[in-house]
Amino acid sequence: MPTKKQKSKSKLKPFFALVRRTNPSYGKLAFALALSVVTTLVSLLIPLLTKQLVDGFSMSNLSGTQIGLIALVFFVQAGLSAYATYALNYNGQKIISGLRELLWKKLIKLPVSYFDTNASGETVSRVTNDTMVVKELITTHISGFITGIISVIGSLTILFIMNWKLTLLVLVVVPLAALILVPIGRKMFSISRETQDETARFTGLLNQILPEIRLVKASNAEDVEYGRGKMGISSLFKLGVREAKVQSLVGPLISLVLMAALVAVIGYGGMQVSSGELTAGALVAFILYLFQIIMPMGQITTFFTQLQKSIGATERMIEILAEEEEDTVTGKQIENAHLPIQLDRVSFGYKPDQLILKEVSAVIEAGKVTAIVGPSGGGKTTLFKLLERFYSPTAGTIRLGDEPVDTYSLESWREHIGYVSQESPLMSGTIRENICYGLERDVTDAEIEKAAEMAYALNFIKELPNQFDTEVGERGIMLSGGQRQRIAIARALLRNPSILMLDEATSSLDSQSEKSVQQALEVLMEGRTTIVIAHRLSTVVDADQLLFVEKGEITGRGTHHELMASHGLYRDFAEQQLKMNADLENKAG
């Protein structure tokens, strides 16, 4: 069974391993720590110089050299302390920058499945809050611990040399302070750990609600979300109060111990001064050294508390860094993407015992339009995720021509796919940046304008004050739904994909926007292998092939007319769409 010491080492090992992964400058870090040590050693001279000053104090004996020496020591200590603090903070920031870069690089390369199962707010908290915990340890508490140890040992050594009897009295204070501070430190760690977790949860809640504030307002759900947020705030408040209660004990208890020690030293030391066994200067030095023993005890205790917090933060960061990355480069390059896509008995479930798709087989012809229709929850969107290779089939194979798609690199596969989703998400930035998003090559203004023109987006872009340099806002909120879709179509046109995947959403647009988007889509679909989750009857009627997906299975395939004659559920779908179109026309009339 591992001992307490072995457990402590096993917990520290991952922490130091993580710090090493940031490639810190050990020389600069050692130099900064060495400066802190020198600062502490210099501070140990001050009580001795004060002793000499007090013992030889008289107006006639007061020399400028003595005063100058004490002043010099003070200035040297202050200067070294300032530079050591800066150097430690600089190195700490470099390490944290390296940690954040490691985490960011990992997060960007993690598969979609990770983000489907982990709240984005909690992940953000790991990159921001947890790294700050480690930074505080490196920049403040490690140096405080080392200098604290040196200060305590150095002070006690000097005191023993000066007067061993009085030093024994001081030594009683050290274990007494430890008995008080160590349990408080453990309690602080427990509360801090809970606070970190609660902060991550609260950050997750904010990231969930604020991006969807329009839905909140449209649903009159402000009070509901206020209640959820208030619960998180209340939990953080309670943890803050618990932390304040513990912290409120530290200062008074240290003061109590210090005052008790001070009274004992002054009382016993005063007796020795009266008997001539101790000089007045030595007693003053004793009192100053007493402060240099008690105060670092608090630093040492805080170090262990912060170390425990950092170990907890490290464990969570290591969990992210241990996740398997999505390999985008291994595999062949696609030389010809104008080939049929074949689904051969494809099954998939997010959980092994709950299949969403069950032995789906189909051929998506190259250069033609395949429309996927069916009731909600049938598996249409999941099928898209498999085709994009966000997930791999649980069973079965997806092929391009005769080759399984997983023999091609993800990078090559996704280069040949253009995806226009229902939401048509845009990144914060300009219209130009969004149209060129993801392209590694340089794109000319003429190419951007041509893509925008083909997407029926050029006219509205030209009407904007800054045209292509117009900021679209967070998630493209400054643009309308139809404008966002046309920007997404322009982006897809610029990529010039062989395979187009479209999750149709024109039903949510006004008639003019719908017409513009439909025209843009027709241009985009021309000559490409197109797979569309269809909601509009016009798309279905014009498609070369329909796949009717329900309950994870393809229950019908063929043209619109063939399915109207043979598939009852499809016929209901088509008639419902016809009725909706007629209602819209009547309203428009």
UniProtKB/Swiss-Prot annotation:
GO annotation, biological process: response to antibiotic; transmembrane transport
- How is activity affected by pH? Optimum pH is 8.0.
Which positions fall inside the ABC transmembrane type-1 domain?
A: 29-309
How changing residue 380 to R affects the protein? Retains 2% ATPase activity; unable to transport Hoechst 33342. Traps ADP in a beryllium fluoride-dependent manner, confirming ATPase activity. Probably unable to undergo NBD dimerization
**Which intervals hold domain ABC transporter?**
341-576
- Which InterPro entries does this entry report, sorted A to Z? AAA+_ATPase (IPR003593), ABC1_TM_dom (IPR011527), ABC1_TM_sf (IPR036640), ABC_transporter-like_ATP-bd (IPR003439), ABC_transporter-like_CS (IPR017871), P-loop_NTPase (IPR027417), Type_1_exporter (IPR039421)
Q: Keywords, A to Z?
A: Antibiotic resistance, ATP-binding, Cell membrane, Membrane, Nucleotide-binding, Translocase, Transmembrane, Transmembrane helix, Transport
Residues that span the membrane, as ranges = 29-49, 67-87, 142-162, 164-184, 249-269, 278-298
List the subcellular locations: Cell membrane
Q: Where does ATP bind?
A: 374-381
Q: Which family does it belong to?
A: Belongs to the ABC transporter superfamily.
Query: What does the entry's free-text domain comment contain?
Result: In BmrA the ATP-binding domain (NBD) and the transmembrane domain (TMD) are fused. This is considered to be a half-size transporter that undergoes homodimerization to be functional.
Q: What is this protein called?
A: Multidrug resistance ABC transporter ATP-binding/permease protein BmrA
Native organism is: Bacillus subtilis (strain 168)
Q: State the gene name recorded for this protein.
A: bmrA
